[in-house]
Amino acid sequence: MLKKISISIAVCALLAVGMIAWLQSMIPGTEEREALKQSQASDIPYLQNSITQDRGKILAVVTSTDTMGSSGKTTGFELTELARAYYVFVANGFEVDIASPLGGEPPVVIDGDDMGVYDYAFLNDEEAQAKLTNSIPLKDADSTDYQALYFVGGKGAMFDFPNNREIKTLVADVYQAGGIIAAVCHGPAALLNVKLDDGTKLLENKQVSSFTNEEELFLIPDAKEVFPFLLEDSLVNEGASFMAGPRYLEQISNDSRIVTGQNPWSVWSMADMTIRELGYEPLPRIVTAEENSVSVLQAYELEGFGEANSLLKQLKSEPEQSVDRLLIAMHGIVAAMDWELIKLLQLLRLLIISGDAYIATLGPVDVAPRSFVA
């Protein structure tokens, strides 16, 4: 028995070493990464074709909190969750203002492995950076200026969104005026404790998605001590019907002008759905490599290996489409950490099948893979 256990441990160790080496081979090299950092919004075809009609304004709200409670861990808003939605809104004819509870320059979380073309373009966009650095204090935001509110994710939102008086007022006023309320990941914390003029809770009997308990506790096992609450639990306690998708994959809910996304992989669809709720068909864009991989992984989770394999082969046959293999590999690592060995082997098969599919980081509409730290 001891011999069998030793052999099993050795095999697992070899698999782990091999997986790490494989992952490292997928990460873009220094030259590619440096070129990516020079991305400009003016070079992205999707943005070159932006709607010129003035369709109104959207207020994006980010956290002002830079520390996770008493844990001492730094936090802020997620840059990718702001940048990608920002450009979808701009491309579709909306001016975007940026606000935060305290105003001024908010704390930001930037992970180099997460960053893609749109994200670096945002960092290099003088107009966008001026709005971010001088974010509007929420007390100065006028609800009548905006057709929609968008609450950006980031763990800091768990601390300064839920009981913020200005947020409650803005959300209630914009919603009751017929506007759209959008949020992603930890952003839906802003929708807690919001009451309408008739005394009902905004979220009562509404379908809502956010970062799930499962996702939170996998990343931060002591999340119940780090955060004042678990977001999924609080949304359910608020009377919402919580809609959870597979872990770390796209899931959006759209109910009565409230559009919410589960995690960072839901930003693109959440932003497009917000445009639809505002009464417009979103401007077409080439789907990113990351989104394609999310679709493959969702097909695997919901319909099995066969469907995922078929979709992957279809994507490989289309010249404009690319696949983010690193994201598939990361899900394989999660499966290994959960000791789901059959799932791990099947995801490895998908990686092998992907063959010459590549991580497209330098194309004008592709996004580099992100880690699981949301």
Model segments located where?
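Glycine-centered, small-residue-biased loops immediately flanking beta-strands
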Residues: 179
